Amino acid sequence: MILAVAALAAMLSACHTSGKVDNFTINVDAVSSATTAVDVPYKVANGYFVRNDVKKLPNGKISKQKDFEASFGMAAVMGNDGRPTEIDFNNQYVIAVSKPVTDRLTELEPVSLKGDGDGGLVFVYRTKAGQQLSYSMQPSLVVVVDKKYRGMVSIREEK
């Protein structure tokens, strides 16, 4: 019995000092960064546009329907997917990104939404600029997030 306890103690202390267990190496930095950068689910809201009477571009977290409606209007179109995405502000909030009016075809695409490890969220998007248009457009992106994912939201553009 004493021999079994001594062998177990030797195995445990060897695990802690070498960082290896049965030929598997544990990289503590990789484990820490993986747990702090947790993917947060979201969905892109379709069928919304930045209202033309908005003075300040809406960028960031919007938790209340009245604040959302002050900046965005609905744009229903024909077809099965023509209705704007439903947003339940009792259980969800949105992250909005918008750019100044342009005469270039411009798409804002979500890249990721992750926890930052300090109780906040980081939303990353990219801008795809295309051909010159004969009219102006206001690029915007709205994503819907469950309210169980709380915290300050930082927005970053992928270059």
For the regions a protein language model found, what residue spans apply to each?
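Exposed, flexible binding/inhibitory loops of compact, secreted disulfide-stabilized domains
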Residues: 15-159
